[in-house]
């Protein structure tokens, strides 16, 4: 038996989400149509609203409904510090720590040559313009500690240092509350190398 075309289209749309395979997409589609049509309609309206109203901040590239986002508009922020993150979700996580009071630049990705993602796709030129505005003194590279994140940090670091900017990288180490017994050897090794004087 062939699926109705409307259901097939819904399954395909759900498959576009990261981490959602064909079976998961099909389960979600059936659930929404069978048990939660109101939720499906709400989801549809929310997606439409988001696509119509969200844009990229002219300064930091994060999602916003205004031309300039709330963080970039905040005059209490330290404009000499610029933290580079991969995604708006990473920016939110850093904000939740309440330890950083500078500004941001959101790459909306990371370098991944095998996937066709180069400097242009991560808005490298915009980052360089922003970091070279004469106000920024230090760029904090807060890309993830994956192979691609490390490669991105290395590439950005080399290029920004060549422009005379101070470039720092988030430290790596044992998570707060983490017991050494349960932490992987690479993390422990990095924590040992990045140890600080007390």
Swiss-Prot record:
Entries under Gene3D superfamilies matching the protein: 3.40.1360.10, 6.10.250.240, RecR Domain 1
Limits of the Toprim domain: 80-175
UniProt key word DNA repair: yes
This protein's UniProt keywords: DNA damage, DNA recombination, DNA repair, Metal-binding, Zinc, Zinc-finger
Function of the molecule: May play a role in DNA repair. It seems to be involved in an RecBC-independent recombinational process of DNA repair. It may act with RecF and RecO.
Protein name: Recombination protein RecR
Keyword Zinc: yes
Source organism: Burkholderia multivorans (strain ATCC 17616 / 249)
Zinc finger boundaries on the chain: C4-type: 57-72
NCBIfam families assigned: recR (TIGR00615)
PROSITE patterns the UniProt entry points to: RECR, TOPRIM
InterPro entries linked to this entry: DNA_Rcmb_RecR, Rcmb_RecR, Rcmb_RecR_Znf, TOPRIM_dom, TOPRIM_RecR
Gene Ontology terms describing biological process: DNA recombination; DNA repair
GO molecular function: DNA binding; zinc ion binding
Protein family: Belongs to the RecR family.
């Amino acid at each position: 038996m062939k699926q109705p075309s409307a259901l097939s289209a819904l399954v395909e749309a759900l498959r576009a989400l990261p981490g959602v395979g064909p079976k998961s997409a099909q389960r979600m589609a059936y659930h929404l149509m069978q048990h939660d049509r109101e939720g499906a309609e709400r989801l549809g309206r929310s997606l439409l609203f988001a696509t119509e109203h969200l844009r990229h901040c002219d300064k930091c590239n994060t999602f916003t409904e205004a031309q300039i986002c709330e963080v970039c508009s905040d005059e209490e922020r330290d404009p000499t510090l610029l933290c580079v993150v991969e995604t708006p979700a990473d920016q939110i996580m850093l904000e939740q720590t309440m330890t950083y009071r500078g500004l941001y630049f959101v790459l909306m990705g990371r370098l991944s040559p095998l996937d066709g993602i180069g400097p242009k796709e991560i808005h490298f030129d915009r980052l360089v313009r922003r970091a070279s505005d004469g106000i920024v003194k230090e760029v904090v590279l807060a890309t993830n500690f994956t192979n691609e994140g490390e490669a991105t940090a290395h590439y950005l670091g080399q290029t920004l240092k060549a422009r005379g900017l101070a470039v720092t990288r988030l430290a790596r180490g044992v998570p707060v509350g983490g017991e050494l017994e349960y932490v992987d050897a690479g993390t422990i090794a990095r924590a040992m190398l990045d140890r600080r004087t007390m």
